[in-house]
């Protein structure tokens, strides 16, 4: 049983170690660590544990009052279990059907549970950024920074902050940011409205509402729980719109952002489409210039010399050389109209006003044209809308974008949103492969195709218990809670293995199946309960954890506790009933195969079947 249990647990966790993508890199250590730890525990169980038992365990030693009370409790539970087990085996089909109905009903909780990549953590740190219109001066940005700092100083939950205006990224002096550190949860004041201390998420929601009232600025708050996974901005909602025409992308990105702000699906909506400083464009009329004998080179040199300056010579001073550049005075090149008054020389030597052959326009410049997969793309990002889960925000934002985009343009998740969808696909694949590999290992261990199915019947009910506990505890379905389900798969089937293996041992003595189940299951009830109680006790501190970063531990531990509780209670009844049913199926099939018409007889060659049937007839 120990070897079978260890092999089955390792079979569950090895697929996790070989997952691909971002999640695979993150959980590689997890799968390897669990697998190695379980293998070492098997080595310890077959070597050191027998030695310790021989040295310290004394049979017949008088138990203390606590030990006697525990023994009486387990004896009563075993006696009660024995009384119930008989009717369960008598109504085995009803028991299995009822348990399957419970499992199917519990799957509806998947849609009710909020889904997110990783849970938002109350780390007490977040980033505040503000952007003003391009072209705003440093003085204007500094005034905005002072307003933001004044507000941060007024919040009693804030411990310290640092930051400033200008010089942060490509937006230059028209933006600024601040890194904010909050007081520890224990040190935060009690909110008079709610009568309790506010979490980081609640404080950020209040700040977002208050700072949005400041006119002329686009302010965003972001916590960093997802940035370590995806890098970049680390916004929980990120997607790109892609297409061939940059002007269409720019126009539609504005419409999408406005729609998301209106419907509330995404907060702090922003994009990487940043219009730069306005630029003056000199557009020549080539036909008219050709008629007047003016070359494009002459137009370019005239504008460059007047605005940028032309080198007229060099000045030497003490062995050093300095370029002498000649250009118009500052007051002569302040306005776009000044360019039109410049004179350009024709091939005949005549001077013509530049405005006669060019058109002067002012237009905003682009800081960059971004591409993804060789397509022009604009990234739109933001935080989760208030009262929504990450999955709801992502799905709603993508649906909104796809309604606005014309044919030939598309919206695709990126960053955290892409990692969110890929993570559940990867974990689902690991979940499936773990079951497949565990089945193959158990089939080899028990030399049976049906008994591994009986053992693995504990897994659906562990999932049911985990989903129910996550739902009632107000948790989400995230990477950590799904990883807890995989961990639960490895632990929950240990109980089934103990029941099936011990029943097989008793039947090898010639005991009939029904009597073997009635004898084996009550005897194995104590180690099953001890294993489950130890697992629940070990996970309870993490399930009740508070403080910075406790959210990641809590979702995994709560699912583990709920899954162990439900699977333990249901397994001790479903596994004996399923064992009885599948044993009848196996016996029936063996009898039919002996006659040549079993379930697997079709796999045999026709001649072989005829020979078997002839042999049976002859006998």
Task: Tell me what each language-model feature is.
Residues 17-26, 100-137, 185-191, 222, ...:
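Transmembrane helices with small-residue packing motifs
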Residues 2, 15, 30, 41, ...:
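Residue-level signature of catalytic and energy-coupling elements of molecular machines
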Residues 18, 36-40, 44, 437-524, ...:
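Hydrophobic transmembrane alpha-helices and their membrane-interface caps
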Residues 23-26, 30, 62, 66-88, ...:
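Hydrophobic alpha-helical segments of integral membrane proteins
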Residues 66-118, 145, 210-213, 239, ...:
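Signature of alpha-helical transmembrane segments and their immediate interfacial
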Residues 32, 421-437, 558:
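N-terminal membrane-entry
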